[in-house]
């Protein structure tokens, strides 16, 4: 990678996180530093966390949510607490961009924060605007957030294919 670039991986299909992480790992292999911040994700299995620890210091993973359950399964009170934690994660992302702490920043499932009303499109735009000249930013999530498309370099929409069953003849 050379220069500033911003990518969105969106849609209802599987593989958005894998695609962004794959690009991040490729860049880490080229000597770049990568930060992955996860939002709205259930707590990962212990094996997944061990894998990410082996990628350090080139790839660093951060989660600010404290509850192991999916956000939608939390009580209203727990969701309020979790929103504060998520906002801390957003502030961390802003700081990472402001000081140029990494070459590649992956904000996993951040697009879903707009659907839940936790983050506005304007706040997302300010994150995009904060991307430095030599930073690559990946935004993932189910939400298409088409309002952001004019401000990014690449949009990849993943859709899980529908396979029509046919009767054997």
How should these model regions be labeled?
Residues 2-5, 133:
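Catalytic phosphate/metal-binding cores of nucleic-acid and nucleotide-processing enzymes, i.e., regions
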Residues 30, 128-129, 164-169:
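P-loop/Walker A phosphate-binding loop and immediately adjacent motor/lid segment at beta-alpha junctions
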Residues 142-169:
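Phosphate-binding/switch region of NTP-binding enzymes
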Residues 26, 51, 127, 147-148:
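Hydrophobic/aromatic ligand-binding patch that stacks against planar heteroaromatic rings
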Residues 73-133:
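Phosphate-binding/switch loop-helix module in NTP-utilizing enzymes
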Residues 4-95:
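Conserved P-loop
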Residues 40-43, 67-68, 111-112, 143-146, ...:
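Conserved nucleotide-binding/hydrolysis micro-motifs of P-loop NTPases
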Residues 129-145:
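Sensor-1/coupling segment of RecA-like P-loop NTPase cores
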């Amino acid at each position: 990678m050379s220069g500033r670039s911003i990518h969105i991986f969106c849609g209802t299909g599987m593989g958005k996180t894998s695609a962004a992480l794959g690009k991040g790992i490729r860049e880490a292999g080229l000597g770049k530093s990568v930060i992955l911040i996860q939002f709205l994700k259930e707590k990962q299995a212990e094996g997944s966390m061990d894998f990410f620890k082996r990628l350090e210091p080139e790839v660093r993973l951060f989660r600010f949510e404290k509850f192991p359950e999916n956000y939608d399964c939390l009580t209203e009170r727990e969701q309020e607490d979790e929103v504060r934690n998520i906002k801390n994660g957003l502030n961390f992302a802003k700081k990472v961009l402001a000081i140029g702490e990494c070459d590649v920043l992956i904000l996993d499932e951040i697009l879903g924060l707009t659907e839940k009303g936790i983050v506005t499109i304007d706040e997302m735009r300010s994150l995009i605007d904060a991307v430095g000249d030599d930073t690559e930013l990946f935004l993932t999530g189910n939400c298409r957030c088409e309002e952001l498309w004019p401000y990014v370099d690449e949009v990849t929409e993943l859709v899980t294919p529908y396979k029509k069953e046919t009767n054997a003849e």
